[in-house]
Amino acid sequence: MESIRVPKQWDSRKRFDFLLMDLDFSSSPGYPYLKEAPTIGQWLGADETGEFNQQRVEKLWFDVQRVLAGDYPHLFRVFIKDEPHKIAKAETNRWRMIVASSLPVQMVWRMLFNEQNLALNKNSARIPSKHGFIQCYGGWMTFLADLQSKGIKYSRDISGWDVGAPGFIFKIIGKLRQRWPGVSDSWIAAQRLVYDDAYENSNLIFSNGVVVRQLFGGFMKSGLFSTIADNSLAMVGIHILAALRSGMPYGHFAATGDDVVQSHVTEEYLQELGRLGCRVKEVLPRIEFMGINYSSQRPEPIYTAKHLANLMMKTCDLGDLFDAYGRLYGESRLFPCWAQLAAYMGVQMRSQDYYRFWYSNPWAATMVDWHL
């Protein structure tokens, strides 16, 4: 596996300044920074030239040092995600919760795990964790052919993974990360600190001001820098353990977050998954992965109703939104419906051939400007 070493000066000011540019400026800065500004970009005073308010940068650097010293009173902010929910979930108050860390903690996670997560992304074709998989430029065809050549034909739907995620698997992932090339004693100490904060002794603040303490190990926080990476590694580890305990062959397996596809499934294996904290709602005899159904040998988006609901709620530019859906539905039988809907709303989408070329042709990767 291609390795990207953890830098010797992983906790330096120079590295901190460099990684500031990788932040999502539209995301929340978490508690308590959100009291001063609703987004990271606004809190940092970011302008169009990439400059920041230096007083804010110095404050953030000071708080990063407090995190590394174990002297930062961190509260995860818990809120309901502003997105469409299924009626059945709404009626039973099963809302999609976001558990977001404070900006100084986000920065420490970036400083610790940036190279590791980047390596996992770059090597997704060779490892079970597939969060670096790129669907466009024909990537979906390579991915589907790889799964089929390995006999992968089952998908499983997991219920309540975030809250039910067991603590032991994150201890294993922590040990795995500690074996990475370039890791130092100071790095390991900081890794243990942030994993304890995230997976063992978390403090969470709700929108009404109530603060609670987590009294059990586990519980994946949806707003971590490594949420997808750690979830993917967790799925791999639990699969191996359940296969060992049930006597089922490991077979072939792929995971992105809690999305899983695999070549083997037995009743005993599913029972072991349940004992390990992974509650399987159903097993599907087809490949559904990362919101795409591949049953027709073409990528068909699964969450069309959610996409339509998003269209009614979004305040962004409709042209950009329909362009994004044009790419997502580029190979779909539903593309003409989206084109008609766009025209009805006064937006002229490009042709399906245009989007199909972008989605499925490797030559598309050589194009510099896709708006020509």
PLM features: residue spans?
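Viral RNA-dependent RNA polymerase
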Residues: 1-372
